[in-house]
Every structure is written in C-alpha cells, then in structure tokens.
C-alpha cells in the first residue's frame, strides 16, 4: 500500500486566509505558516488525507491559492470513513461534531497526527471485516467522492453486477427484501452504506453523528 500524507490547515474564518499548516508523511513532519513550504511538503504524497478534507481543507486551499491544482492528488477523508467503520459507539478520538480530539486547540500538526491515528484505526477496522462486506462497501462506495480515495488506496475497485443480491444474502432478515433497495444503490449509495454499517452492528447500540443524519 502506498504511503499517505496527512495534513491540516488553520483557516481564519473572517477572511479565509490560511494561518498555519501541519503535516505528516512517513517519518517526516511539518509545522509552518509558510504556504510555499507546505506546498513543497505535500508534493511528496500521491494520497492526501485530512479530517473533513473535502468540505474544509481543499476548498480553503483552492480559495487561498487558486493557481495550484489539487486535482492531481487522491483525497481521503476520515470524517466520512469514521462513522462507516465505527457505527456502534462514539469514536474515542472524536469529540462533539466529529472534530478531532487533540491536546492543543488550533495546532494543525497535532490535528494532522490525530488524523493519522484515525486513519490507521479505520484501516484496521476495514481489514477485519468479512470479505463479502468489504466487497459490498467497495461496490457501493468506491465511486463516490467521499470514499473513492480510500478504495483507490486499498486497490479495491470491485463492482458487482448483483449488488442487491449480495446485500440481501449478507444481511438476510435484518433488512427488508423489496425493490426499493435497487433505487437506494443507484441514487443514495452513501446513505445506504451508513445504514448497512449500523445494521451490521445491531443498530440499537449504534451512535450516528448528527451530520450523517442531515
């Protein structure tokens, strides 16, 4: 598996200016307010991972440094992965609103390292899933923006032509056997993925983050 570069940004909410950067790649770390230094650092990685990278970090970077093309990177978002892999209880590294639990506020290096911990916990949780459930998640989610990067990293682009049948076989009587499942697969794969994750752990004990329910 290829190495992943983890990072975080501190953004001024008043003007969108990025004040500070933190990063971790293999054994190297970065903590700087210098944008050019940050850009040089992330060139080391093909896969970029941050907590809420899709809706926070990348949009902030694109606004602050619009001449840089971030599309060449494959993005992995631990915000979306966490409730998929840990639906049964509040994840211990996350606090209210699924922000990262760190020792210092507004320290992007600490947040980048916390993201790294979250990612490897997610990776370990995924690796112990039954193979059939891995294939269901890959087939359902690997072409969505929220999960595409993760499955590219895992080199898992499995796409089943009989996904409905595979879901029904794996979950059995835990889910309703009706034709609406095909519509959910086609139109709401992410929502269905989260629902299946909850069902898989006997959903009465699950805790779903508020942002997922929205």
Predicted feature descriptions by range:
Residues 1-214:
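DEDD superfamily 3′-5′ metal-dependent exonuclease/proofreading module
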């Amino acid at each position: 598996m290829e190495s992943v570069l983890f990072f975080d940004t501190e953004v001024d909410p008043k003007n969108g200016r990025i004040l500070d950067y933190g990063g971790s790649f293999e054994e190297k770390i970065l903590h700087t307010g210098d944008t050019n230094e940050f850009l040089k650092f992330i060139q080391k990685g093909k896969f970029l991972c941050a907590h809420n990278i899709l809706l926070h970090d990348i949009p902030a970077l694109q606004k602050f440094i619009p001449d840089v093309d971030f599309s060449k990177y494959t993005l992995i978002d631990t915000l979306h992965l966490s409730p998929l892999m840990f639906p049964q209880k509040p994840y211990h590294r996350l606090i209210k609103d699924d922000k990262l639990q760190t020792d210092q506020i507004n320290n992007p290096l600490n947040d980048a390292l916390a993201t790294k911990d979250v990612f490897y916990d997610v990776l370990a949780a995924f690796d112990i899933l039954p193979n059939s459930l891995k294939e269901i998640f890959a087939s359902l989610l690997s072409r969505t923006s929220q999960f595409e990067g993760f499955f590219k990293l895992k080199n898992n682009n499995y796409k089943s032509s009989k996904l409905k049948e595979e879901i029904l076989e794996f979950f059995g009587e835990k889910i309703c056997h009706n034709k609406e499942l095909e519509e959910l697969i086609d139109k709401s794969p992410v929502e269905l993925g989260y629902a299946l994750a909850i069902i898989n752990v006997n959903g009465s004990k699950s805790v779903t983050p508020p942002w997922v329910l929205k």
